[in-house]
C-alpha cells in the first residue's frame, strides 16, 4: 500500500468515525461510510491540510470514493 493510500484512508477513518479496516478503496463516502455533505466538506479540508494542496470545489464534488481521493492526490502532487 502506498503511503498516500495509507494517509488518505487514515484521514477518511478519522473524519468519518469509522475503523480504518472498514475504509476500502471502492467505498463511497456517502453510501458506504455514512458521510453527509458537511462530512465530505470537512474530509476535503483535511485532505488539503494533510497534503498541503488546494482542491477546487468543482474537483472536490467529483471525489466521492476513497479511490477517487487517492487518484486525485496522486495526480496533483506529482
Swiss-Prot record:
Pathway: Lipid metabolism; fatty acid biosynthesis. GO terms for molecular function: acyl binding; acyl carrier activity. Residues 2-77 form the Carrier domain. Its main location: cytoplasm. GO terms for biological process: lipid A biosynthetic process. Keywords: Cytoplasm, Fatty acid biosynthesis, Fatty acid metabolism, Lipid biosynthesis, Lipid metabolism, Phosphopantetheine, Phosphoprotein. The keyword rRNA-binding does not apply. The modification O-(pantetheine 4'-phosphoryl)serine is found at residue 37. GO terms for cellular component: cytosol; membrane. 4'-phosphopantetheine is transferred from CoA to a specific serine of apo-ACP by AcpS. This modification is essential for activity because fatty acids are bound in thioester linkage to the sulfhydryl of the prosthetic group. InterPro entries: ACP, ACP-like_sf, PP-bd_ACP, Ppantetheine_attach_site. It is found in: Cytoplasm. Pfam families: PP-binding. Carrier of the growing fatty acid chain in fatty acid biosynthesis. Belongs to the acyl carrier protein (ACP) family. This is Acyl carrier protein. It comes from Saccharophagus degradans (strain 2-40 / ATCC 43961 / DSM 17024). The gene is acpP.
